[in-house]
Regions:
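Aromatic-enriched alpha-helical interface/lid elements that frame and gate functional surfaces
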Residues: 228, 233-309, 313
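Oxidoreductase and adenylate-handling cofactor-binding alpha/beta cores
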Residues: 173-193, 206-218, 259-265
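N-terminal helix-loop segment corresponding to the beta1-alpha1 unit
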Residues: 1-189, 367, 373-399
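Conserved PLP cofactor-binding pocket of PLP-dependent enzymes
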Residues: 307-328
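Terminal low-complexity tails and localization/encapsulation signals of metabolic enzymes
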Residues: 1-11, 223, 239, 321-399
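Glycine-rich beta-alpha junction loops
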Residues: 42, 127-128, 200-205, 242-244, ...
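Conserved Rossmann-fold dehydrogenase catalytic segment
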Residues: 129, 157-165, 188-204, 223-230, ...
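Short Pro/Gly-enriched beta-strand edge/turn motifs at strand-loop
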Residues: 45-47, 216-222
Length: 399
């Protein structure tokens, strides 16, 4: 892993839970930031309990989103003074509480920037800071539903199907990280912080950018097409003798090459399939022809033949196949991060390389409260003060 640490020296106070906020701050930590994760003393981030799967008792969901951070176990209701002091020495403050909660408790952006004008303050919400849904709670599947994604996923005529990864959560985290980094860059010129707002709902709108533009331009409402792509055919998954293959014949030349490999005599010259608009209009008939031909091939043989003909195609692989694939290994995307409780821990690095070096995580995810004492000492608390706070249950000190 490379030593690309452009955010080295940046202190982040992270008051987020679940996935979107933690993924944002994991990215910042991998880029060099000192991320201080604030967690409730009793159980910590709720994601610590999400599972199975668990790895030696640790939630793999939590392990995958919190590498490189330090953990401070702090009761926000009783430890406001502690939180404010930590924010006084920070560059970034990020929270994912319901709208108005931070302000009502005294650690909204205005209150914190009165004391630290350089502070970049980021909020991750469900449906945005304005509008009739601003108070609604939300998780990734709710955003997928309300944001229109579920209207596009699933088989034609069937119910919506949740996308099998938390792409709205992680996408929102990436947008938050982008906004924070942009605000930090501007701060170098202005000396002042900014307030960043992102939400799951807004991320779904960005993900649906070309579908929304298409609707606004045509008045046509896109629907479900299974694994197919509405505007191109053939462009979908087909079943082989022993698996599934995604075929992407995105133009006339590729369609002709596919037809040649599958020995679809007369199909290229069939008036129903001459151009892509023709093929889209007669998608069902074309899919039946191709499906019957593909079913006679093994996955390996078909992929080899399509590759030789220059037709884009890929096997449908499961997570185990992807995690152990030589391509994944060659890219260095799976990283070992020895953890006190999970010595063989491996997780996924950032999908970015700088000068040929993978941007990876610098430390394993923290145990709850592992860094409370160290961080409080850095903020100016002495041993007696820390002991008093721990005795009152305001903080939890590990060990």
């Amino acid at each position: 892993m490379g030593e690309f640490l452009p955010l080295q020296g940046v202190r982040v106070i992270d008051v987020t839970t679940s996935l979107a906020g933690p993924y944002c701050t994991e990215v910042l930590a991998a880029l060099g930031a000192d991320v201080v994760k604030i967690e409730p003393p009793a159980v910590g981030d709720e994601a610590r309990t999400w599972g199975p799967p668990f790895w030696h008792g640790e939630s793999t969901m939590f392990l995958s989103m919190n590498a490189g951070k330090r953990s401070v176990a702090l009761d926000l209701r009783r430890g406001l003074e502690v939180l404010i002091r930590l924010a006084d020495g920070a560059d970034v403050f990020i929270q994912s509480l319901r709208p108005g909660t931070a302000e009502s408790r005294g650690f909204g952006p205005d209150a914190l920037r009165e004391r630290n004008r350089r502070l970049v303050y980021a909020t991750i919400g469900a449906f945005g800071r304005k509008g009739p849904w601003r108070e609604k709670p939300g998780y990734d599947p709710l955003a997928q539903a309300a944001g229109g994604i579920l209207s596009l996923t699933g088989e034609e005529g069937g119910p919506g199907v949740r996308v099998g990864v938390s792409m709205v959560d992680q996408g929102t985290g990436i947008w938050a990280a982008l906004g924070i980094i942009a605000a930090l860059h501007e701060r170098e010129q202005t000396g002042a912080g900014r307030t960043i707002d992102v939400s799951l709902f807004e991320t779904t709108l960005a993900l649906l950018s070309y579908q929304i533009t298409g609707y606004l331009g045509s008045g046509e409402i896109p629907g479900r097409h299974g694994t197919a792509f509405a505007s191109i055919a053939p462009y979908r998954v087909f079943e082989t003798e022993d698996g599934e293959v995604m075929v992407a014949a995105g133009n006339d030349k590729l369609f002709a090459a596919l037809s040649d490999v599958l020995k679809l005599d007369g199909v290229v010259d069939d008036p129903r399939f001459l151009t892509n608009p023709d093929r889209v209009a007669h998608r069902n008939e074309l899919d039946e022809i191709i499906a019957a031909a593909v079913a006679r091939w093994t996955t390996a043989a078909l992929l080899a033949a399509l590759e030789a003909a220059g037709v884009p195609a890929a096997p449908v692989q499961d997570v185990a196949q992807v995690a152990e694939h030589p391509q994944t290994t060659a890219l260095g995307m799976v990283q070992a991060l020895p953890h006190p409780r999970v010595p063989e821990l491996r997780t996924v690095a950032l999908p970015v390389s700088i000068d040929g070096e993978r941007v990876g995580h610098r430390a394993p995810p923290p145990e709850l409260g592992a860094d409370t004492e160290a961080v409080l000492r850095e903020a100016g608390y002495d041993a007696d003060e820390i002991s008093s706070l721990a005795g009152q249950g305001v903080v939890r000190v590990s060990g």
